[in-house]
């Protein structure tokens, strides 16, 4: 009957050839080639046909001999191969078996491809919560209708390339199915605790088994359709005026929160909702009895990026307080339904925190400097008066000395 094999990088096919009415004791040659049943042409791998040749000397006119083919079958996944054999005696072909419809000469290489999704959202966005689930739809080809198969899946951590471990155990799922046709689909559901998976990308690896033998698998750590993306956000709050984290407690305060995101679905609709928290109390900041909130709707073009949420408030009564921004990211369905997918709420996170301080007291402006001019002497200004009196006394002494000298000289002249 039909034989199945896994399309591995190295597949060995053994074709057992029965012969009769051949010359015993003579050297014979068997030449085999693999054919693509769908096209009716020789199978080509990397541009080359897959062939095998065996020379043997039969001891009797009838018997069996094995012809072995070894090849890379990864490119042939999903194909049905048929072995054609020709028997030569010298240069003469004396027998052949070339029947594309012969089940005994046929090797089936099944294939499977998978598409993973979050059943709650209907897309590839994972929810980091205690009871999470992933549904993987496996599309298979070249199975045997009516036979029982097992599909087995494992969740992989794309970053490490290793199995995802939750509580030190891999996350797996398994189910049996019986295809009605050689090609079709089947589903496998994974249920697990995803609370610690924010920011991670998981990849579903699948394999199909027939009688405990793997006959098809899909194990591509970089495959987007097999991946589930768990979003993550981080925030950085600053003064909307100068970009630092110190804000004057004015009547008009602007806080700008830059939210970086990872693992979103490009083209999908999202909504960020933020609220200001009083770090001292750990509760929402209330102004006039109402929380201070802000929100931003956006559609990412890439899986990773950033967006801003801006808060405006009267901060005149908040001097000395430290405010922390809490952000929650929602996925918005086509009907407008908002579904929370992740958040960033850490009351001790310095990056999410701004500090409000009192306005400094007004400092009077210093007078403009002008060239100094001597002021007139004023009553009560002792230093200038003493200075002038000293100068005056010196002048009087000098005048007196000159007068005495003048009088003395005059008298001397008169006596002469």
Name the predicted role of every residue range.
Residues 59-70, 180-191, 301-312:
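Aromatic sugar-binding surface patches on proteins
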Residues 1-3, 113-124, 234-245, 375-378:
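Short, solvent-exposed loop/edge segments of extracellular or virion-exposed proteins
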Residues 73-83, 194-204, 315-325:
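Short glycine/proline/serine/threonine-rich loop/turn segments at secondary-structure transition edges
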Residues 380-394:
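Juxtamembrane/start-of-transmembrane alpha-helix segments at the extracytoplasmic/lumenal side
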Residues 93-110, 214-231, 335-361:
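Short beta-strand elements
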Residues 355-383:
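C-terminal low-complexity, Ser/Thr- and acidic/Pro-rich disordered "stalk" regions positioned immediately N-terminal
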Residues 3-11, 123-132, 245-253:
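Short, solvent-exposed loop/linker segments at the N-terminal edge
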Residues 397-416:
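C-terminal membrane-anchoring or membrane-association module
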């Amino acid at each position: 009957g039909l034989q199945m094999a896994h399309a591995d990088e190295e597949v060995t096919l053994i074709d057992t050839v029965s012969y009769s009415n051949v010359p015993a004791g003579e050297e014979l040659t068997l030449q085999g080639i693999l054919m693509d049943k769908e096209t009716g042409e020789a199978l080509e791998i990397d541009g080359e046909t897959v062939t095998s040749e065996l020379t043997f000397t039969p001891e009797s006119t009838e018997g069996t001999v094995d012809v072995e083919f070894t090849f890379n079958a990864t490119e042939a996944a999903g194909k049905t191969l048929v072995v054609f054999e020709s028997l030569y005696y010298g240069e003469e072909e004396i027998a052949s078996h070339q029947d594309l419809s012969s089940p005994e000469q046929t090797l089936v290489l099944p294939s499977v491809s998978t598409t993973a999704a979050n059943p709650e959202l209907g897309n590839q966005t994972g929810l980091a919560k205690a009871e999470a689930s992933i549904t993987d739809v496996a599309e298979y080809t070249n199975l045997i209708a009516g036979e029982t198969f097992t599909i087995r899946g494992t969740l992989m951590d794309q970053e490490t390339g290793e199995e995802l471990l939750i509580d030190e155990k891999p996350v797996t799922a398994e189910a049996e199915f019986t295809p009605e046709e050689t090609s079709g689909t089947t589903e496998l559901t994974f249920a697990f605790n995803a609370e610690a998976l924010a920011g991670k990308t998981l990849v579903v690896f699948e394999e199909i088994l027939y009688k405990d033998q793997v006959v098809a698998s899909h194990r591509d750590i970089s495959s987007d359709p097999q991946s589930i993306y768990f979003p993550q956000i981080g925030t950085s709050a600053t003064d909307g005026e100068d970009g630092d984290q110190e804000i004057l407690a004015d009547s008009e305060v602007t806080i700008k929160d830059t939210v970086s995101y990872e693992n979103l679905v490009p083209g999908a609709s999202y909504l960020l909702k933020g609220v200001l928290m009083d770090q001292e109390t750990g509760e929402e900041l209330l102004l006039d009895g109402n929380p201070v909130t802000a929100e931003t709707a956006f559609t990412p073009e890439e899986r990773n990026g950033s967006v801003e949420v801006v808060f405006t408030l009267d901060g005149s009564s908040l001097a000395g307080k430290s405010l922390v921004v809490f952000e929650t990211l929602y996925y918005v369905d086509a009907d407008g339904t908002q579904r929370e997918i992740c958040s960033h709420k850490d009351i001790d996170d310095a990056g999410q925190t701004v500090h409000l301080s009192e306005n400094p007291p007004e400092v009077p402006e210093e007078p403009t400097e002008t060239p100094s001019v001597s002021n007139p002497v004023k009553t009560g200004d002792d230093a200038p008066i003493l200075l002038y009196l000293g100068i005056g006394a010196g002048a009087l002494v000098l005048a007196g000395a000159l007068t005495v000298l003048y009088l003395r000289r005059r008298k001397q002249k008169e006596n002469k």
